[in-house]
Amino acid sequence: MAIADILLPTCNRPESLILTLSGVASQTVTDIHVIVSDQSAEPIGDLPVVQTLQRLIEARGGSVEWHYRVPSQGITEQRDFLLNRATADSVLYLDDDVFMEPWVLEQLLKTLHTEQCGFVGAFPTGLSFRNDVRPQQQIVEFWDGPVRPEVVNPGSPQWERWQLHRAANLYHVSQSLPPGEFRRYKVAWIASCILYDRAKLLEVGGFSFWSRLPRYHSGEEVLVQNLLMRRWGGCAIMPSGTYHAEVRSTVLNDAGTVDGHALDLLPEMVERYAPETVEVK
């Protein structure tokens, strides 16, 4: 069994997928199993550069499992499929538009194993915002002790933590850290690059709710992370060492929006998986 399974959903973004796989192939942790679920119009796995990167991952001690699956039933179904294929204790959900510096997976694994929390994220920076400094959005709450369970309700003051993940705010705050120092900070939710404790994720139902969402939706990781934080806590690392390709989203409908949000299911999911936190405000 690999140290970590990297779960990678992709759809019609060959250029950014190549960027993502390049980061995967350079990780200091090499005992990895990459599971790709491709729902592109044409299979991306047949591209020569993609095949070369797959061979590189394998040559360094990893393995790659590729699935071409059409038609698409939405991103949450993709995540559910990938989770059902996973066997490692730790699973990294990695979007197909994120580049990781070589140390990222190692640091995420170290943090998850130390904290024994539900998840640890590494939020990517869009470097087109590198010169767009927004001090009013750079409020950060660090975990100075162990990561603990917490309730972060939509609309609460803690929900505003998401502002740190706008533009390049996290990148700018990270510049104040001494070289080589990492900090854990509190989140409302985190997207794009998240290492989960697989057993804990399954204990809150994973992404099995996919059939209740319309084809074009969002918020599936917001939902599961909210449940995980209530029971075991969650955090993110700074610096993140991840960078966003800043390409067009593939989870939106033709109007450029979504037809539903998974967070609408939060009240009943809390009742089912974290009932002891229902009354916490």
Residue ranges and their predicted role:
Residues 13-26:
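Short, well-formed alpha-helical segments that are part of the catalytic scaffolds
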Residues 91:
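Short aromatic/hydrophobic "clamp" motif used to bind/position activated sugar donors
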